[in-house]
């Protein structure tokens, strides 16, 4: 008896015999058969164990059915034909991944892998079974059923069923019977009051937006009262009339062969009208006299360039001076320009380059956007109220006036050109070009032959102290 035990393989000792009083499994192998079959553990560890999901499902679900030392499964020898068939090689080959292998009664199956979080979170529409896009009106539903229920409640629609009011509502047939679909929405828990509350909120939001728009209109009208664009336009028109009078009386004596001289003469005459224009701009005369002089001295060149650039919109490849003369691009590049610049002939190219910049960066842009005189006047008022001018006694007051012009111009653009949302920004983008070109013109053009030998500060002071000279 002891010799027979010693002659068995080591693994066969792990196979326990059934306790006394219990019937042996009908298919349990005999000792002779055990010696001819490979050990169970070796079968588990053999390449067959890597066959795939069928074997792993069986082994993980049941453990080692023939081993009594397995603590996790509190069962004795199991006589299930399913389990006994797994011992034989032929039984292993008969199992496929599609077979429904069930554990013994009372044994909870253990899946080989737990479902991922995305799988567990997928929900279907409670009405038609399509993929749910979330919880709508109290029920997980798809976008189609959500929209159907929303339209039905908001429009207070009523439907009738052509059959027995028990139509199938699924993903394919949900549009066949609107009555049954709506009844199923209600039956699954969709709430009409949620749709109605949503409608009320949207109405309230629309009212709030209307109030905000009304507030914008009120604020823009308030800004216009503080800096009325009508007054700014009046100042522009008064200066334009004065310019036309100058042009009628003095155009005959100018020489078109000397464009720089013509420009300087135009600047000379325009300084008189510029001071009159500034006096007509709202709140400018309320500043101290010294601050008025500082602002005009800091911005007069940009103010004049803005004026003749806008005046030249109708001229092709040239500018129209206040004297009424046209200066063509070719004239600015001609040799006659160098007559004033005897000391440095290099200035010829500089003057031609400045002229080209005026045409491309100012005249052309103003023409393309069809800048009107009100917008021109507001841009010039922004240039005039320069809080960065050196020597101001009250720069904060000047900055406040500039901000009022900004607000009035923006309100004017919204009211006059409602379809051009970027127009206000386009207008402001002309200011850097005016600044840059103005600095270049100061270097090369306008100080020549300017009001004789009179210092510009003295001239401006006398003009500002004088009463209005434009009628």
Swiss-Prot record:
Keyword vocabulary terms for this entry: Activator, DNA-binding, Metal-binding, Nucleus, Receptor, Transcription, Transcription regulation, Zinc, Zinc-finger
Domain NR LBD: 224-467
Region of interest called Hinge, as start-end residue ranges on this chain: 198-221
Chain spans, region Disordered: 1-34, 196-226
Top-level taxon of the source organism: Eukaryota
InterPro entries (UniProt xref): NHR-like_dom_sf, Nuc_recep-AF1, Nucl_hrmn_rcpt_lig-bd, Nuclear_hormone_rcpt_NR2, Nuclear_hrmn_rcpt, Retinoid-X_rcpt/HNF4, Znf_hrmn_rcpt, Znf_NHR/GATA
Broad class of the protein's primary localization: nucleus
Record flagged with keyword Amino-acid biosynthesis: no
Tagged with keyword Magnesium: no
Family: Belongs to the nuclear hormone receptor family. NR2 subfamily.
Subunit structure: Homodimer. Heterodimer; with a rar molecule. Binds DNA preferentially as a rar/rxr heterodimer. Heterodimerizes with rarga.
Record's protein name: Retinoic acid receptor RXR-beta-A
Organism (species): Danio rerio (Zebrafish)
Protein's gene: rxrba
